[in-house]
């Protein structure tokens, strides 16, 4: 009886924290868009940033709390991986925002984080939100390495692909840049300086950005460069995740590669982003062509991460649609 009461209290506390995180993220997104489009006020801007940091702290505490209570790294099921992805997206975008001093980054990324968090907290069945004992094959140190590398790659590749999508949107629709506050946030001198002096930037790309004559040119070229750099960071994480997964699979099931649907789509994702980086580095691709390929990668990542997991087949299945 006492154990049942404790379990109910833990479940209620988890639900409260998860709902608080979602509501806080929704508020943060609204504050970002309000400060960007309606009122460019320092108080609202600072409140939005504080709310974002607060969301990340609560989310980090929530994951740490689950780790402490269940005695294994909180990446054992879909719910925890979605929470972990939200935490990574929050941290990475806040780092980029700190470097660029541009609120547009948060306004772009936060809707994605809210959708991820909403899907985890509101759409997944309650049974899928609870931690359960790991099967023997998952009771390995490879769990933390493999899954964390894959989640880091998903977070960075999704952000890089988002920048490519925004590049295409702004390239096609010039009216979006007519709002003064948005234009100022994206093309202020410090933002361009941070992009053009980064160690990840090619000299040729930096010169093109510096020589751009209009705010619009500087904006879309900066987005192109930032997308390239972010994808360039995420690709090694994806590579390490695939390799560590193969080694782990050999230890657990005696085979490095079994053409499981998840493995197949991870390879497809790797090939897409390898093609993107190859085209940029050796073929000189930039602008629309590179952005189309990067944008395509956004959907490929989601298919790899979620799509194949819901089919009910393979070693990585969550069986949600069964």
Curated annotation (Swiss-Prot):
GO CC field: chloroplast thylakoid membrane; plasma membrane
Membrane topology field: Multi-pass membrane protein
Entry keywords, A to Z: Chloroplast, Cytochrome c-type biogenesis, Membrane, Plastid, Thylakoid, Transmembrane, Transmembrane helix
Any one Pfam family match given in the protein's UniProt record, by short name: Cytochrom_C_asm
Location(s), subcellular: Plastid, Chloroplast thylakoid membrane
GO molecular-function terms, A-Z: heme binding
Stored InterPro entries: Cyt_c_assembly (IPR002541), Cyt_c_biogenesis_CcsA (IPR017562), Cyt_c_biogenesis_CcsA/CcmC (IPR045062)
Main location: plastid
GO biological process: cytochrome complex assembly
Function, in words: Required during biogenesis of c-type cytochromes (cytochrome c6 and cytochrome f) at the step of heme attachment.
Family recorded in the similarity comment: Belongs to the CcmF/CycK/Ccl1/NrfE/CcsA family.
Subunit structure: May interact with Ccs1.
PANTHER family referenced in this protein's UniProt entry, alphabetically: CYTOCHROME B_B6 PROTEIN-RELATED, HEME EXPORTER PROTEIN C
Protein name: Cytochrome c biogenesis protein CcsA
Originating organism: Heterosigma akashiwo (strain NIES-293 / 8280G21-1)
């Amino acid at each position: 009886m006492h154990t049942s009461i404790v379990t109910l209290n833990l479940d209620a506390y988890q639900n409260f924290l998860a709902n608080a995180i979602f509501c806080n993220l929704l508020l943060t997104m609204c504050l970002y868009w309000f400060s960007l489009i309606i009122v460019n006020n320092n108080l609202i801007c600072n409140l939005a940033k504080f709310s974002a940091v607060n969301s990340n702290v609560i989310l980090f505490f929530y994951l740490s709390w689950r780790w402490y209570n269940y005695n294994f790294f909180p990446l054992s099921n879909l719910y925890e991986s979605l929470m972990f992805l939200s935490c990574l997206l929050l941290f990475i975008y806040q780092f980029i925002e700190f470097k660029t001093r541009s609120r547009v980054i948060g306004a772009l990324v936060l809707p994605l984080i809210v959708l991820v968090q909403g899907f985890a907290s509101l759409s997944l069945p309650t049974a899928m939100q609870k931690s359960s004992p790991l099967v023997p094959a998952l009771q390995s140190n490879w769990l933390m390495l493999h899954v964390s590398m894959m989640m880091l790659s998903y977070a960075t590749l999704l952000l890089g692909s988002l920048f490519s999508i925004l590049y295409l949107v702004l390239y096609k629709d010039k009216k979006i840049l007519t709002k003064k506050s948005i234009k100022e946030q994206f093309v202020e001198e410090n933002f361009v300086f941070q992009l053009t002096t980064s160690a990840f930037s090619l000299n040729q790309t930096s010169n093109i950005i510096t020589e751009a004559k209009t705010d619009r040119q500087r904006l879309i070229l900066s987005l192109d460069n930032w997308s390239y750099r972010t994808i360039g960071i995420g690709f090694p994480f994806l590579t390490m995740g695939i390799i560590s997964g193969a080694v782990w699979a050999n230890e657990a099931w005696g085979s490095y590669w079994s053409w499981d649907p998840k493995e197949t789509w991870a390879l497809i994702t790797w090939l897409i982003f390898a093609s993107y980086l190859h085209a940029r580095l050796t073929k000189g691709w930039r602008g629309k062509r590179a952005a189309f390929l990067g944008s395509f990668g956004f959907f490929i990542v989601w298919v790899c991460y979620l799509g194949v997991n819901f089919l009910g087949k393979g070693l990585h299945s969550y069986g949600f649609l069964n």
